[in-house]
Amino acid sequence: MIALTLAALALSASPQAAQDRAAPSQSAGSAAPAAETGATQAARQWLALVDAGNWQESWAATAQSFRSMNTVQAWQSASESARVPLGRMLSRIGRGEESIPAPPHGYQLVRFRTDFANRAGASETLSLAREGGSWRVTGYFIE
C-alpha cells in the first residue's frame, strides 16, 4: 500500500511526553473518550480542522517545525490532493499512542483507524511534540 505522506516528521518534544503515555483507546466518530491523553485529544482536535478542509487553521495549529518546512500553500495543495479524494470522515477509532525517544526529548505518535466515505480502514498516524505547553502536530501520514 502506498503511503500518502503529507508532512515531514520533526523530532522535538519535551520530557512531558513520557508522562502522557496511554493504552490504546477506541472511539466511534470523532468524540474523545475521557481516558485519552492530551496528545490524543490534541490530535483529534487538529484532525477536526483537517476534516473540515480548514487548511489555513490546521496549518497554523501545527508545531513551528512543521510550519518552517511547509508553507500554507504547500500544505493546502498536499491536503487537497490526498485528503479530499477520500471523502467525508465517517468514523475514527483510536489505535494507540507511543512515545518515541528521539533527540532532543522525543515525540508522541498517535494512530487512528479511520473510515472515509471513499475509503474504509485507512490508517492515520500523527506525530506530536510539546510546544508552548501544548501538544502540536509535527507530521501527518495516511496509509
Regions from the PLM with identified roles:
Residues P24-P33, Q73-S79, E124:
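Short charge-dense sequence patches
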Residues T40-A42, Q56-H105:
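Short solvent-exposed beta->alpha transition segments
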Residues G96-E143:
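Exposed beta-sheet edge and beta->alpha loop/turn motif
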Residues L4-A7, F116:
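Serine/threonine-rich, low-complexity intrinsically disordered segments
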Residues I2-L4, L11-A52:
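Short, low-complexity N-terminal intrinsically disordered segments enriched in polar/charged residues
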